[in-house]
């Protein structure tokens, strides 16, 4: 849903109350650095020697922070804060040195099976290729997520690394499942927390699996909003990103996409076929077949169809912006009408203005951009080109086809009315 999988994982971790986060990077490390910036610490795994080796690269981070350590896969986006929190509670209650977060699934083919002892503790994790027929029938599988006691984890990982270096362990790689067995060999306890949702095990190794994750995430978000009072009569093509907030009794129609941290109020109609990105739309707005980027639309506005609102714009209360209008970096006052085929760029419009068909604010001279000001109650005739910097005074009008070019505090032309006699 327009966000890297790692963002979903980090969001769940932070929601669970964990602030100290370290990401182990490998292939494409430069892209990860650019994306994460300074939001969390990163360390590089220069050689791909397994998940155990990857976590060992964060050894100084683990030793510095101490205590219990959560290890997650960066490409398993459906881990959630409740699962993390509840697994930690079990980890501490049972006195485990390692607790694997598991899931029960109908078809465990390809996953490591959780083999438990008679007392309920984890005896080992058996991979598909090594499982006996009895073990292969086990439906509880390893999600790849673990809680570790930090000191036990580092002791195990260092031991596994030394065994690999000395040739005692002939395997090229070592894994977190190996760390579990190493910790068990110290006489310490291993446990398992079974998550409520099996979705936590899901990851993506190709575009088909990525599409499946996106569809599952999309359905989750839509159901969340529908349960909160948002109407989505037909969900085809509707995408709502996790950061979006939508008020009750708003209707989202087919083909609409709501991205980023957009906020939409109550009793709105969005769509069909609309895009709202990082924008705020207040109550009672109609937004039809239009796009809005990083802007604010105030209550009661009527937008569309085929309107493009570019960043930095504020559309006032009860404003009408009709078909084939573009607004860019402009403020439009309440009750103003821009009905069709116009461009309003780098402009400040007052209240109660009427913009005729085919009007434009010419904001670019070829080397700089300037602003246009239209004051309250002005009437801009069709095919007017306002060449910035220019000002149209209060209650003034321009005749059809005019091209005002001068800044004036006085009206461009006073309105006239017919009088008897």
For each predicted feature, which ranges?
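Conserved N-terminal catalytic core of the sugar/cofactor nucleotidyltransferase
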Residues: 3-89
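Conserved core of the sugar-phosphate nucleotidyltransferase
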Residues: 19, 30, 34, 38, ...
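Structural beta-sheet core signal
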Residues: 22-23, 70-71, 98-101, 192
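Generic preference for hydrophobic
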Residues: 42-43, 125, 192, 232, ...
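Short beta-strand-to-turn element immediately C-terminal to the catalytic PLP-Schiff-base lysine
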Residues: 114-117, 147-148, 204-205, 241, ...
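Conserved alpha/beta core of the MobA/IspD/sugar-nucleotide pyrophosphorylase nucleotidyltransferase superfamily
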Residues: 139-246
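Phosphate-binding active sites in nucleotide-utilizing proteins
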Residues: 236, 241-286, 290
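Glycine-rich hexapeptide-repeat left-handed beta-helix
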Residues: 278-280, 286-421
């Amino acid at each position: 849903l327009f966000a890297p999988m790692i963002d979903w994982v980090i969001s769940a971790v932070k929601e669970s109350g964990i602030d100290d986060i370290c990401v182990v990077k490998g292939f494409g490390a430069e892209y990860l650095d650019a994306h994460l910036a300074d939001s969390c610490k990163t360390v590089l795994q220069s050689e791909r020697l397994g998940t155990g080796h990857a976590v060992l690269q964060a050894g100084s981070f683990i030793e510095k922070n101490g205590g219990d350590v959560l290890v997650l896969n960066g490409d398993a986006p459906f881990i959630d804060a409740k699962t993390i929190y509840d697994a930690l509670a079990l980890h501490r209650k049972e006195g485990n040195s390692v607790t694997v977060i598991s899931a029960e699934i109908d078809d465990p083919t390809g996953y490591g099976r959780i083999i438990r002892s008679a007392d309920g503790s984890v005896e080992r994790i058996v991979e598909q290729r090594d499982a006996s027929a009895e073990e292969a029938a086990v439906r509880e599988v390893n999600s790849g997520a673990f809680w570790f006691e930090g000191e036990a984890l580092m002791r195990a990982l260092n031991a596994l690394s030394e065994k690999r270096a000395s040739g005692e362990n002939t395997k090229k790689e070592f894994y977190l499942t190996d760390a579990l067995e190493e910790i068990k060999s110290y006489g310490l306890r291993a446990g398992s927390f079974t998550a409520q949702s099996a979705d936590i095990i899901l990851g993506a190794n190709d575009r088909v699996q990525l599409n499946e994750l996106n569809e599952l995430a999309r359905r989750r978000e839509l159901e969340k909003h529908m349960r909160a009072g948002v109407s989505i009569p037909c969900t085809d093509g509707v995408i709502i990103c996790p950061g979006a907030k939508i008020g009750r009794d708003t209707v989202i129609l087919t083909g609409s996409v709501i991205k980023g941290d957009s906020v939409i109020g109550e009793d709105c109609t969005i769509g069909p076929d609309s895009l709202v990105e990082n924008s705020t739309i207040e109550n009672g707005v109609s937004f039809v077949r239009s796009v809005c980027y990083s802007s604010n639309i105030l209550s009661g506005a009527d937008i569309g169809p085929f309107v493009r609102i570019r960043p930095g714009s504020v559309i006032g209360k009860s404003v009408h912006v009709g078909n084939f209008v573009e607004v860019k970096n402009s403020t439009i006052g309440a009750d103003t009408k821009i009905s069709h085929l116009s461009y309003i760029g780098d402009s400040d419009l007052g209240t109660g203005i009427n913009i005729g068909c085919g009007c434009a604010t010419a904001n670019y001279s070829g080397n700089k951009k300037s602003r246009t000001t239209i004051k309250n109650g002005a009437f801009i005739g069709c095919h007017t080109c306002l060449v910035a910097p220019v000002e149209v005074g209060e209650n003034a009008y321009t005749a059809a086809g005019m091209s005002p070019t001068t800044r004036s505090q006085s009206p461009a032309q006073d309105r006239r009315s017919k009088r008897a006699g």
